[in-house]
């Protein structure tokens, strides 16, 4: 169906690839690139309560959801930014584990040897991303899943998909609560225990030369709380008297904290050795893969534990919970948490290079709320640097939209449906033919990309701009994304039904409105661009789409209707070409 514009489309993709690699790098910076940005007023002074235009409502929803819909835009226009956020926070959380459990029960009822797996975790993710009413909670939970990373790529984690669904639920449940609670829930979750190896971590044994596993102790500081270096509230590095960055922790801190994370294992009605090890089925609680781990005093270190200036005294009887409380209190109270976590949330939701003033305002809101994630999320989304249209128009503002969010934005904008009702999009990790990214399947604990990633040998790198998502953007993934969207726009997305016996891919998009405009190329381009990009389309993209549409011959319908099929195919091809070219354009790939 796309053959008639293959040459033009190929030319466009080459241009898009080059633009994404170069021009986009300059466009995925932050509003704080110059001195003026640092003076942008905070939320109280500079943010209107109601979007002045539908375009601004659409831009807000691009940051706060998995993609704007007309209904979302209408709601934000009716009640305003802050009220919409409050309304979203009040919505009950959707449960991925409940969906997984229901699917598992259905499969086992049909075949006792069968069970649900990773696919059902991804089905639930996309169902909620595309249809869920708690868009903000799910969007923030997804952002948190890229900070507090567990990955189904790991065989232990991937082999326990019910636990992964429960982990995502846990992030959603804590998305607007206390950071201190969130951090403890992360630390005690069995999936994190498996992933970073503090599940069944044993106390030191000098006689055997055994020391506690330090993996989680290191990462909970480096990645989940305080980072490697001491920070100013603005996120800038604190410098010592020697002019060098000051490290937040030492090897001794890691060793001391590692003792805290000994003696933690599966939850259950007792703390028998067999339950700690999970030796037999009778000692394996059905909920053990998603219920917070419990402490087993017989495996917990008795010795003094020193870290970050705190001390847990030697214990006559090991008390894992008391040790953990001191550790969590110490980490959550560290002044680095606000700027360290806040900056990453800004990067995930709004812009890759926020100004120091923006980061400081978010950190201050977090601190004033006593470590309140709700206050942090509001500050991220309502800050004038996030909402000011002039700032957003700056050449270095915004971020490269990651592949998963490009897909969800498209499918939400077009009201995609699922033939099975399950949204069987599945794993999309292949770089050459798919998105090169699958939710909850990062290659390592460092996520798909690092928050401080600077693309080498680029103009952005020379300018000191960060572009995290560019770490998974290269010639192969650009072509893979284009191929995946080409096939998806033409035929649909995902597998051919739950049993692979359906006649078409499960997730379908209707182009009826676009097909009706196929004989009016400019109107067709306007509709597609308004639906997918709004004002972000600019002025250069429309002529390209119009030219591509015109290049597809649309024959006149013969009086006897004998060529109706050819006419219908041409109209459909024109409509799909317009959509496809918008989806691979740099204007869509960059979130402003």
PLM regions and their residue ranges:
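Mature N-terminal segment immediately following signal peptide/propeptide cleavage
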Residues: 51-73
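Active-site substrate-binding loop specific to GH73 endo-beta-N-acetylglucosaminidase modules
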Residues: 77, 89, 107, 118-126, ...
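Flexible, low-complexity segments enriched for small/polar residues
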Residues: 58-65, 106, 110, 148, ...
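Bacterial Sec-dependent N-terminal signal peptides
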Residues: 23-48
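N-terminal accessory alpha/beta regions
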Residues: 68-174, 199, 272
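Hydrophobic helical h-region of N-terminal Sec-dependent signal peptides
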Residues: 14, 18-22, 26
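Bacterial N-terminal signal peptides that target proteins for export
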Residues: 2-17
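Structural motif
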Residues: 47-55, 116, 131-138, 211, ...
């Amino acid at each position: 169906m796309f053959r008639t514009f293959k040459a033009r489309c190929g030319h466009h993709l080459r241009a898009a690839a080059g633009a994404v690699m170069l021009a986009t790098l300059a466009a995925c910076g932050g509003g704080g690139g110059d001195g003026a940005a640092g003076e942008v007023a905070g939320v109280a002074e500079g943010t209107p309560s109601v979007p002045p235009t539908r375009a601004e409502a659409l831009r807000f929803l691009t940051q706060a959801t998995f993609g704007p819909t007309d209904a979302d835009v209408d709601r934000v226009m009716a009640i305003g930014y802050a009220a919409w956020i409050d309304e979203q926070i009040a919505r009950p959380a959707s449960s991925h584990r409940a969906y997984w459990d229901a699917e598992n029960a259905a499969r086992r009822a049909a075949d006792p040897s069968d069970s649900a797996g990773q696919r059902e975790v991804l089905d639930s993710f996309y169902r909620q991303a595309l249809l869920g009413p708690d868009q903000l909670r799910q969007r923030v939970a997804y952002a948190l899943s890229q900070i507090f990373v567990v990955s189904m790529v790991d065989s232990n984690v991937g082999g326990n998909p019910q636990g992964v669904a429960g982990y995502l639920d846990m992030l959603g449940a804590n998305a607007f609560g206390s950071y201190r609670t969130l951090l403890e829930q992360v630390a005690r979750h069995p999936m994190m225990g498996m992933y970073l190896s503090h599940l069944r971590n044993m106390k030191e044994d000098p006689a055997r030369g055994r020391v506690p596993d330090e993996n989680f102790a290191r990462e909970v500081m480096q990645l989940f709380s305080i980072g490697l270096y001491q920070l100013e509230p603005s996120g800038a590095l604190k410098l010592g008297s020697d002019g060098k960055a000051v490290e937040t922790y030492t090897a001794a801190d890691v060793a001391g904290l590692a003792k805290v994370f000994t003696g933690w294992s599966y939850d259950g009605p007792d703390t028998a050795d067999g339950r700690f090890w999970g030796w037999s089925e009778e000692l394996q609680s059905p909920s053990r893969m998603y219920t917070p781990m419990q402490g087993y005093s017989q495996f917990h270190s008795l010795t003094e534990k020193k870290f970050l200036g705190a001390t847990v005294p030697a214990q006559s009887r090991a008390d894992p919970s008391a040790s953990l409380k001191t550790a969590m209190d110490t980490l959550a109270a560290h002044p680095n948490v606000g700027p360290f976590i806040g900056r990453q949330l800004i990067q995930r939701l709004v812009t890759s290079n926020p100004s120091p003033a923006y980061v400081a305002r978010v950190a201050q809101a977090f601190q004033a709320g006593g470590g309140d994630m709700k206050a942090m999320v509001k500050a991220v989304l309502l800050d004038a640097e996030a909402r000011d249209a002039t700032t957003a128009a700056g050449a270095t503002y915004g971020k490269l939209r990651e592949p998963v969010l490009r897909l969800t934005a498209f499918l939400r904008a077009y009201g995609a449906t699922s033939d099975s009702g399950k949204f069987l999009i599945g794993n999309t990790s292949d770089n050459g033919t798919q998105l090169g990214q699958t939710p909850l399947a990062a290659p390592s604990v460092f996520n798909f990309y690092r928050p401080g990633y600077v693309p080498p040998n680029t103009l952005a790198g020379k300018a000191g701009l960060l572009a995290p998502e560019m770490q998974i953007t290269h010639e192969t993934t650009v072509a893979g994304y284009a191929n995946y969207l080409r096939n998806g726009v033409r035929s649909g997305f995902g597998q051919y039904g739950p049993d692979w016996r359906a006649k078409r891919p499960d997730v379908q998009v209707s182009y009826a409105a676009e097909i009706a405009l196929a004989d009016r190329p400019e109107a067709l381009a306007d509709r597609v661009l308004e639906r997918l990009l709004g004002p972000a389309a600019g002025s250069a993209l429309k002529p390209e789409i119009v030219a591509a549409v015109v290049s597809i011959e649309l024959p006149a319908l013969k009086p006897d209707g004998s060529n109706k099929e050819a006419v219908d195919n041409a109209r459909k091809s024109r409509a799909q070409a317009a959509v496809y070219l918008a989806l691979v354009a740099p204007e869509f790939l960059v979130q402003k």
